[in-house]
């Protein structure tokens, strides 16, 4: 009798030595995705800066000024309402090479009042207050060119979008292993080339290429590890695969602290990809994919290898494998199926909004922390730590309480934390950090749960399409986020947090409109998906229960 891979793994080991070995190898892949996803915090760090004015350095040296005195005497003030632009993007139109300038308040010798001196653009570049370097300091991505930093981060999310859309087809067509190794190789090459890019344009091109393949490779790793384990372990393994990403956040903070120059940082975080090429000899092809390609003999050989590694033996009867697919009529899904009926249309709209919101808040909070934090390395490290309890809370709650309430609560906590942080005064920095960490934990939980629930709300024949369409909003959000964060902070540092707060609270409220999926079988048809939120009052079932009740006394 034909059996499925899950049936065989029950005898050959669902999560034993082989699967643990594969998980460790693929978890390393998950951890190295971190620098591409949120590395903008360190690669694009914008330090305090001011216009470079010819003659100022010589005058400062002659007068023996301290850095604070040089800043006070030669640089425009911050402007009204604490606006930083005049200080950072303008300079006095003064010839500092004049010998008439004294060493004590040199501008006082001019006939014009200091506040009325004309300001000009930074023609000679900028002076940056940092011992290291970033793409901002090297390519002068400040003032009129600051939008180029937004474009840099948006480009990697554009790559994520197209890479994620195409990876499902490519992995199904050519296999998981070949696709994984190809993405790793391209990612490694593009990462090194970006580290040695001579111009901003070339750097942008190689970052886009990294985006095209890096998230795709991360997703293939996720697919592989969930296909190697038995059905009972898939959800837990999937969550811990993303915990490995969190470990990558902690490592990234340490590496960035040790390597404050962006080219060395980019080169270092790219190096592990060359190690992953050795996976050619370590990781086999997915047996499930081989069966889908009618390569049952090779699939059986790999499964026997898995059983041997696990110290298990397979019964002689388990020799004929089949896919876990129904033999019924094949349906061709379309986007219209996601919006044709009222309940599925509601599910689609809410899921798309929540994917978008999760991406905007998760990436946005990290970017905003890089702008507002006192110590970006420690702030980044501490905020990453809260992702561990977030994963633990998901594991504890989703099968006990359900999906809907933890999901809604996590969105609302994230939104409320963002709004609360706006009104905390600057001298209570410790409280601001605690509230920010709560927000980060909330949105991390929401991000994880939406991945799980997305597949549980759609019927079988449109499930994959629904997941791909809805999750694509995650990358759309990632494209918008850098423009949202960096442009709004130019108006007011806390303004992005107000936007994040509203988005999070609305997302939490919308989640409550979705049905609970805990303990429910995955819907097979549109009718089942439409009736998920309604109690079933089936007449035949009622008659059956009545007959069953009457039969009991007769026995």
From Swiss-Prot:
Sample GO molecular function, one term: putrescine transmembrane transporter activity
Species assigned in the record: Pongo abelii
GO cellular component: apical plasma membrane; basal plasma membrane; basolateral plasma membrane
Glycosylation sites: 72
Free-text note on domains in this protein's UniProt record: Contains one proline-rich sequence (Pro-Glu-Ser-Pro-Arg) that may be involved in tyrosine-protein kinase YES1 binding and is required for the activation of substrate transport.
Role description: Electrogenic voltage-dependent transporter that mediates the transport of a variety of organic cations such as endogenous bioactive amines, cationic drugs and xenobiotics. Functions as a Na(+)-independent, bidirectional uniporter. Cation cellular uptake or release is driven by the electrochemical potential, i.e. membrane potential and concentration gradient. However, may also engage electroneutral cation exchange when saturating concentrations of cation substrates are reached.
Family: Belongs to the major facilitator (TC 2.A.1) superfamily. Organic cation transporter (TC 2.A.1.19) family.
Protein name: Solute carrier family 22 member 2
PROSITE patterns: MFS, SUGAR_TRANSPORT_1
């Amino acid at each position: 009798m034909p059996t499925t891979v899950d049936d065989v793994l029950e005898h050959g080991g669902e999560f034993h030595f082989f699967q643990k070995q594969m998980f460790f190898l693929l978890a390393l892949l998950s951890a190295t995705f971190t620098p591409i996803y949120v590395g903008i915090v360190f690669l694009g760090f914008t330090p305090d800066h001011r216009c470079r004015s010819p003659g100022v350095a010589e005058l400062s040296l002659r007068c023996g000024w301290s850095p604070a005195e040089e800043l006070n005497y030669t640089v425009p003030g911050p402007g009204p309402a604490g606006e930083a632009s005049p200080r950072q993007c303008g300079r006095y139109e003064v010839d500092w090479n004049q010998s008439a300038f004294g060493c004590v308040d040199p501008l006082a010798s001019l006939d014009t009042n200091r506040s009325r001196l004309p300001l000009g653009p930074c023609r000679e570049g900028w002076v940056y207050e940092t011992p290291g370097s970033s793409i901002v300091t090297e390519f002068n991505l400040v003032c009129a060119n600051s939008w180029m930093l937004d474009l840099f981060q948006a480009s990697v999310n554009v790559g994520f979008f197209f890479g994620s859309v195409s990876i499902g087809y490519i992995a199904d067509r050519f296999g998981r292993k070949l696709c994984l190794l190809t993405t790793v190789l391209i990612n490694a090459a593009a990462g090194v080339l970006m580290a040695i890019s001579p111009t901003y344009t070339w750097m942008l091109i190689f970052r886009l290429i990294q985006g095209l393949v890096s998230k795709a490779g991360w997703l293939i790793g996720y697919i592989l590890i969930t296909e190697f384990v038995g059905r009972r372990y898939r959800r837990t393994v999937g969550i811990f695969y993303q915990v490995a990403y969190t470990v990558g956040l902690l490592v990234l903070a340490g590496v960035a602290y040790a390597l404050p120059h962006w080219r060395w940082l980019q080169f270092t975080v790219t190096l592990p990809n060359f190690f992953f090429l050795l996976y050619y000899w370590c990781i086999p092809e997915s047996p499930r994919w081989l069966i889908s390609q009618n390569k049952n003999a090779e699939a059986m050989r790999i499964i026997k290898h898995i059983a041997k590694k696990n110290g298990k033996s397979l019964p002689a009867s388990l020799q004929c494998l089949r896919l876990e697919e129904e033999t019924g009529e094949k349906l061709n899904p379309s986007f219209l199926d996601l919006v044709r009926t009222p309940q599925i249309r509601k599910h689609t709209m809410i899921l798309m909004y929540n994917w978008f919101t999760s991406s905007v808040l998760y990436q946005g909070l990290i970017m905003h922390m890089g702008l507002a934090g006192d110590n970006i390395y420690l702030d980044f490290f501490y905020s990453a730590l809260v992702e561990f309890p977030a994963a633990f809370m998901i594991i504890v709650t989703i099968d006990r309480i359900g999906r809907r309430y933890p999901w809604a609560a996590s969105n609302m906590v994230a939104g409320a934390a963002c709004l609360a942080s706006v009104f905390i005064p600057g001298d209570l920095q410790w409280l601001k950090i605690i509230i920010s960490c709560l927000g980060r934990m909330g949105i991390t939980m929401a991000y994880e749960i939406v991945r799980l629930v997305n597949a549980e709300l759609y019927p079988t024949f449109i499930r994959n399409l629904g997941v791909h369409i809805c999750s694509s909003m995650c990358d759309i959000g990632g494209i918008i986020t850098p423009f949202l964060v960096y442009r709004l902070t130019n108006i007011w540092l806390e303004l992005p947090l107000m936007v994040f707060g509203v988005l999070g609270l609305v997302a939490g409220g919308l989640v409550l409109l979705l049905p609970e999926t805990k303990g429910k079988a995955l819907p097979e048809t549109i009718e089942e998906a439409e009736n998920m939120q309604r109690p079933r009052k089936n007449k035949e079932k009622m008659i059956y229960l009545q007959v069953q009740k009457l039969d009991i006394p007769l026995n």
